Amino acid sequence: MPRNLVLFDLEWNIGYKPFTFNYHGVQQTLRGEIIEIGAVKIDEDANVLDTFSIHLRPRIFRSLQHHIAKVTGLTQEDLDKGEPILQGLRRFMKWCGPDAEFAEWGLDDVPVLKQNLFLCNLDESRPTVWYDLQQIFLREHPRKEGEGMKLESVVTRMGIPMERPFHDALSDTLYTCLLYT
């Protein structure tokens, strides 16, 4: 088990029109611009040592896409009041520390994090190691026919009390932490 394990979740906004950029000589489409980060540092027994939560103000996709608003419950005002994305990402990566290994439910968020770090001219070489906790969970709890793998479905299946809203980055991270234990 890594000494500095950070479980995290991102909520990201998408544009009404695609945004393409040159990423190390390759044209890429931005998958999403981060608008919320939730993270926990855990010890080897999966006890929560510290939490991190922040709303970010995007630079590229400034208008909150209606589907994202519906899913997350965030408003345009939440985005407008968020910490500027550059400062927020810098603060998050500093909180994680240089030796952090990341874990998430699925593998969607690390590529989005790396794209956003790059677009903010921040070091996107970290994390160098990250884990897909969904796959680790499946080894212990094989999926049955018709069972969904969305976080909410798995939390329900495992009988974990749903005391926090889903699609809130910190809440989703804390649910993931409960599944990890």
Place the predicted regions along the sequence by residue.
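Conserved small/polar residues in nucleotide/adenosyl-binding loops
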Residues: 180-181
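A structural motif
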Residues: 122, 143-156
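Conserved non-catalytic scaffold segment of RNase H-like nuclease domains
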Residues: 2-111, 118, 152, 156-157
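Alpha-helical transmembrane segments that form the membrane-embedded catalytic/substrate-binding core
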Residues: 169-176
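Short, glycine/acidic-enriched loop or turn micro-motifs at the edges of active sites
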Residues: 12-14, 135, 175
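Active-site flanking residues adjacent to catalytic metal/cofactor-binding acidic residues
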Residues: 8, 131, 171
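A short alpha->loop->secondary-structure connector
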Residues: 117-127
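Short alpha-helix plus adjacent loop in nuclease-associated cores
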Residues: 131-146
